[in-house]
Each structure stands twice: as C-alpha cells, then as structure tokens.
Amino acid sequence: MKRILIVTGQSGSGKSSALQVLEDLGYYCIDNLPLALLPEIVAKLDHENNLEQLALGVDVRSTRADMQEFDHVFEQLQKHGTVDVIYLTTQDQDLIARFSASRRPHPLANRFKSLLQCIHEEKQLLIPIQFRATVHIDTTDKSVHDLKHILLSKLGQSDNLIVILQSFGYKHGIPLDADYVFDVRHLPNPHWDLELRRFSGLDEPVKQFLEASPQANEMFEDILHFLKKWLPAFAEGHRHYMTISIGCTGGQHRSVYMVDRLKQALEAEWSVQVLHREMKHWS
C-alpha cells in the first residue's frame, strides 16, 4: 500500500464530502470504524488486496481513551505505507449554521446540553489527532466544489479529466463502460494477411500496413478531431473519466493500432490511460 490518508476534524466540517472526493480519485474509503480497529483492518487489506490508496474517516465516536492511543495507531499504520492526516476545521458559527440547516444532531449531543458545548468539547477530544495533521483545511464558507479543489491541491493531484482509450473486439461484446464507441471494422484487416496475423496493432508491420491505408488515416483524423473538440467541454463538466472504446472484429489489430495512435496524439495535453481488452485472446 503506497498511501494512507486519515480524514478527520470537527463534525460538520466536511469529512464525508472529503471522503467522497477521495473515493472519486480512486481511494478505497472506510468511515466510522473504531480507532483501535484500524491497524488490524489495514493490515488485513494490505495482505489480501492490491490497494495503493486508502482513506480512513475518524471522528469523535471513538472514545477519549481511543483518541489518547492515536500515536500508537498512527505508528502501526506507518508499517503499511505513507500516512498523512487531513484535519478539517470550521468556525463555530458556520458549524452551528450547518447543523441547523441539516437538522442532524451533533455526535456528542447526548453528553452536552448545547451545540456550542459539543463543538468545544469535540475540539479537545481531537487534539491528539490534530497534533499529527499534515494537511489542515479550513472549510468555513467553502462549498463541496471548493473543498475538492483544495484537496487536489494539497495532495498534489490533478483535477484533469482522465481519458481512457480502450480497444475491443466486437465478437467478444461491446464494452458496457464506454462513453463513446467507434467502429473500425471497415478498415483493411491485417488478420487476412498470413504474415501479419500473429502480430498486434502495437507491432511495426501492422502499423505500416494500416498507415498505408487512406481510410485508416482519415478515420484517425476524424476521431482525433472529435476528441480534441469535445474533451475540453467534458472536462469543464467536472467529469473524472471519459472512456473512448475503439472496436474491430477481434480486438487485436485495427482497434489496437487506432488506440495506440490516438494515445500518442493526445497524451501531451491529456492524462491518457490505455486498455487493450482482448489482449488475452491475441494469437
């Protein structure tokens, strides 16, 4: 496991929203587990799952005794990856307004008479964790959208659209996760050339074969023009991923070639990921 984030802070300051943002960024998120159980759970996840990014939500539903043991918990978690603590805070009046608007009780409401007392006591309970915080975020007057951009900036991650280029074979079915599908079965098929059949669209002989085809070049230019025109609009709509699927008959030659060529044309401007779905079927 490469990175573990502990997300905590005052109730009402945006912990749930922060975890949602992190989940969208690919973090595996766990919320509201007792603090004492975290080392055991993280050790199990690290052993049984190929997780690279984990986010753990912690709040005052853990006991005061648990909070005092936070340093020990923190050290145990460090055995499994780099650990950072994100601490969210908000001014008292803003917290009061948020609880009034949501009509939800404060987690300490059963112990104290007033909301302000709950807020002040919670601050004291969280001191052991706040002391360890590597990222402090004041969410006063901040929207969820603002919080997202602050998190991205603090964590050194990009808010750019990720373009997933996927090749596939129609005989194995159309991908269900595709946002756009382009059919390149009309292009000359290297499969029928016995010298080329054993290669894929990543190999130079197949590339040369298809680059000699005016149809293949025209199809490439048309798809590239579409993507260059519309990807900025998709990015402005706050999409995290856009999956563009290119299909040929078997998913070995024409679609693979087209995906590879599009990747080279787009990767200077966009974050591009490539998936060749039928690679296991290649001859």
Curated annotation (Swiss-Prot):
Which intervals of the chain form a coiled coil? none
Matches recorded under InterPro entries: P-loop_NTPase, RapZ-like, RapZ-like_N, RapZ_C
Is the keyword Nucleotide-binding assigned to this protein?
yes
* UniProt keyword annotations, A-Z: ATP-binding, GTP-binding, Nucleotide-binding
Q: A GO molecular-function term, please?
A: GTP binding
Residues that hold ATP according to the record: G9, Q10, S11, G12, S13, G14, K15, S16
Xref: Pfam families: PapZ_C, RapZ-like_N
Query: What is the recorded name of this protein?
Result: Nucleotide-binding protein A1S_0588
